[in-house]
């Protein structure tokens, strides 16, 4: 019995931790899921999310991947990944011809879609080229300026509040104190 107890206690030390979620761009569902999953706060890994974008340097692909998610969030578009096809040979048959593509929101945001290139699915070149304009339509010009001013360390959380929010609150309190002094 004592040996079993030692085995149970020591077994976790020898096991290798693995990512249960990996980058998968084999079908429309996997591509969109990979993109959104790796941009969530609890699983944030923008390098992996950027793998859903083809033909850009990693730094640019990361920025584009983040902006795609921000546009979807800013428009209030919830992506129901369970409705996205898992067929790697999915064809969009809307229109006169069929293409290997999947449009996330055909009526509300037809510019954002994934397409099959080779045997993998990526966000389309049209999506990538139009995302800057879509972002500008959704967010005012000063939002991007503020995002560039706040360093990555400003997004660390303390007691459930991001550091930049805490600093902003302290600045407001200080201003309020001096105004009403």
What are these regions, as identified by a protein language model?
Residues 56-112:
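Surface-exposed, charged secondary-structure patches
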Residues 38-63:
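Short, well-ordered alpha-helical segments enriched in acidic and aromatic residues
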Residues 17-41, 145:
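Short, low-complexity N-terminal intrinsically disordered segments enriched in polar/charged residues
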Residues 18-22, 102-165:
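Short beta-strand edge/turn micro-motifs at domain boundaries
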Residues 12-17, 178-179:
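Hydrophobic membrane-targeting alpha-helices
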